[in-house]
């Protein structure tokens, strides 16, 4: 940790105090943990970032995870960056009501900033976000750049917890922020489109901390010309889905393969209208080609042209309970898988397959076309990609 109590005053390791000054304070025995009031020792070595450490190994309620040198460097770097923006950050401010200690707290904005380097579960993430929300505190997660893997043009491996912390920009696109304290650089991921459980298409922007104003950039919409490249990535992903469906043995794939097989359909030859990035599709962690194909199949099997959205929702809820379908958790986004389902229905409406009659009722306009061969499927995917 970077903060301690000395004579009932907060002191920190981000200032200009010398090693000799910390040694003198330590000899007086007056350096205490602000949370548990136990004595702490100033660690002022040559290799690691200067910090305070507890004398004993007793658990302190104010700390949830061991700190690495990378994490402490990041906190110091972010602190100096905010100071340069004329902000007044408080390092490791302890919020006793919720027993949480954000890495940086901006009291003027009532805003907590977490620099996340260690592993954290999605349940822990949601719990911390809800803790801040219970005190009407805004919060943001900035992730250590080590957590992000760049796989090529517009392609990244994003950890599932990182993706859960995503917010929407002014255009409704997902975004995340990363920071590298070793390079003192921010990496902004914009227009994030998940392709699989970890793989996502995203546009990355690099900024030196000197050229990045968080409060101006946080929800700004960036140039979307790169979306042309996304089409190629998505087309490749659809090809992958088609080529691997027959040998994929996951419970979700096996279930939908079985349903289609008994209705004389092949999952490999799913309709070109399925497996598309419709509005909010990412609320399902299950691949879009699976749940969208099944939704089309449900509509196809209707004996009448009119259908209620409740009919589809009830069936999807059944599949969710059986864990055949999986969803993603986005604590910052006030939406659910039902938004993904409605987004896809509106997508089908734009392509003249269905039309909305009332808020809850839709009408089937024409039959869905299934490719008869893999070659035809690839060709239709390409044609559909160019049109959409």
Language-model segments: what does each one mean?
Residues 162-220:
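A conserved mid-domain beta-alpha-beta active-site/ligand-binding segment of alpha/beta enzyme cores
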Residues 1-87:
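N-terminal cysteine/histidine-rich coordination modules
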Residues 245-388:
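Extended, amphipathic alpha-helical scaffolds
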Residues 203-258:
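Eukaryotic partner-binding/assembly regions in large regulatory complexes
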Residues 81-98, 105-107, 116:
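A short acidic/basic microdomain associated with nuclease active sites
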Residues 78, 102-121, 132:
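Conserved catalytic cores of phosphodiester-cleaving nucleases, focusing on short active-site segments
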Residues 117-170:
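Catalytic cores of nucleic-acid endonucleases
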